[in-house]
Amino acid sequence: MMTQSIRRSMLTVMATLPLLFSSATLHAQANSVQQQLEALEKSSGGRLGVALINTADNSQILYRADERFAMCSTSKVMAAAAVLKQSESDKHLLNQRVEIKKSDLVNYNPIAEKHVNGTMTLAELGAAALQYSDNTAMNKLIAHLGGPDKVTAFARSLGDETFRLDRTEPTLNTAIPGDPRDTTTPLAMAQTLKNLTLGKALAETQRAQLVTWLKGNTTGSASIRAGLPKSWVVGDKTGSGDYGTTNDIAVIWPENHAPLVLVTYFTQPEQKAESRRDILAAAAKIVTHGF
């Protein structure tokens, strides 16, 4: 006859089995994701950095997430957010007009070039920088703030000790291997993007404006967005530079799930290498599987 003591012991073991199984399953899933990212990186011939934050429980998926990568145009999010922060204490700031001269134009100016010998508001510059990756718009935002170091100072005010902006467009895109200028890590950028878009780093009106700009991005259809179900809502900012550097940072709203924050950075050993947005799409598909 089974004694009460033995019965209690068996019930205790049986009760813990689902937990043990769950832990083992999660561990196996995590290993599988890491292995898939490693295989993707190996097949690409480059270096891949990924950081995903699941805001439902703040769990993370990380791959080379503490290594530095050139940000390229993903740094535009920080510059635009810094201007939005200023507008919290000056409700008319975003309507301030900035002169656009022909001499201001650099290598990519799809919006600013239409306003040469005219003006754009800071709000229009923010939209141009984030939704069209307009480099002149980025430079105007940086100039308004007082230089690249002021963008870095804004990051520090948010508790981001990793982000650093040293140059303006287009030189911030040189992405030279080992060069710390204009770099961050995937994890640092993911944490800051979360704070800016889903947290308290900006007041509600400014936060909503940043999210609206990101959701309206026109340059990301082949990057993170391409690896996600079409029904998911995405706000992102892409970036690219020398050494085939190909980046995308995103806030993602899956169906029936809390938002995800995903940073994908990729770079290659050859200066003239082609961009690889397909690598970012593949990484996004790997890390969001199951959500």
UniProtKB/Swiss-Prot annotation:
Its localization reads: Secreted
What are its GO cellular component terms?
A: extracellular region
Q: Name one Pfam family in it.
A: Beta-lactamase2
What stretches pass through the bilayer?
A: none
Keyword annotations from UniProtKB, A to Z = Antibiotic resistance, Hydrolase, Plasmid, Secreted, Signal
Active site positions, chain numbering: S73
EC number(s) from the headed UniProt entry: 3.5.2.6
Top-level enzyme category: hydrolase
Presence of keyword Nucleotide-binding: no
Q: Where is the signal peptide?
A: 1-28
Query: What is an example of a GO molecular function annotated in this UniProt entry?
Result: beta-lactamase activity
Reaction equations catalysed: a beta-lactam + H2O = a substituted beta-amino acid
Q: Does the keyword Nucleotide-binding apply?
A: no
Principal localization reads secreted
Cite the binding residues for a beta-lactam.
Answer: K76, S133, E169, S240
- One annotated GO biological process: beta-lactam antibiotic catabolic process
What InterPro entries does UniProt report for this protein, alphabetically? Beta-lactam/transpept-like, Beta-lactam_cat, Beta-lactam_class-A, Beta-lactam_class-A_AS
The protein's assembly and partners: Monomer.
The entry sums up its family as follows:
Belongs to the class-A beta-lactamase family.
Q: What does this protein do?
A: Has cefotaxime-hydrolyzing activity.
- Additional detail: The class A beta-lactamase family has a specific amino-acid numbering system, sometimes called Ambler or ABL numbering and often misspelt as Amber. A multiple sequence alignment was used to derive a consensus sequence and then the consensus was numbered taking into account insertions and deletions. This allows use of identical numbers, e.g. for active site residues, despite differences in protein length. UniProt always uses natural numbering of residues, hence there appear to be differences in numbering between this entry and some papers.
Instruction: Report the protein name in the record.
Output: Beta-lactamase CTX-M-2
